[in-house]
Amino acid sequence: FSWLTFIDIKIYIFPLYLSCTNLKDYTDKSVVKEYERIDFYGFLVSIVQRLMNPKSGVKRKGILVFTRFLKEAERLTMSIPGTAIVSGETPKSTREMILRQFKSGEIPVVANVGVLTTGFDYPELDTIVMARPTMSLALWYQIVGRAIRPHPNKEAGWIVDLCGNIKRFGEVKDLRLVDGGNGKWAVYSKGRQLTNVRF
């Protein structure tokens, strides 16, 4: 992968205690229960506010928050002026306007619910907040990919993981594709196979 350049990634981890069914993904019920137990909504607002006003004084080039439910996104818009929400229900023209304003810096934070994991082109983006747990390596990698793309105006990509995904999958810099023969590949992190089937 000589064509792939990884930039410095700063990672913060806040683990959650969740349950899953059929090893597919976490249940909505267990996620909501845990969010309410620890006041995840307030915690998320606090983290995003801190990211917007870093001690270094250097502003981020946009903060993209990945949420599981609309409630987290709505809490951000109520608490942080200028925050916008993008979801599957957002009309295409409105979504395009929001993303245009996000890229120009008019909108500092976009909270998105189940969208923008693929097909969103903004290489300058330097901060994502993963405010949803997942058992899906593919989803995790797609989301992380929003912040690790190199750009001349970007010194570092920040992956702020609030749900223990890094603990599950390892740091992005440790992910490796391993050829198992016959064109079958698997994803490994620190010698541990993460994908249950080779692809």
Predicted features along the sequence, with ranges:
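Conserved interdomain linker/interface between the two RecA-like ATPase lobes of SF2 helicase motors
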Residues: 1-64, 183-188
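Conserved helicase ATPase core of P-loop NTP-dependent helicases/translocases
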Residues: 64, 72-118
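Short glycine-/polar-rich loops that comprise or flank the Walker A/P-loop
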Residues: 4-8, 81-82, 123-127, 153-158
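Conserved segment of the helicase C-terminal RecA-like domain
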Residues: 138-142, 146-177
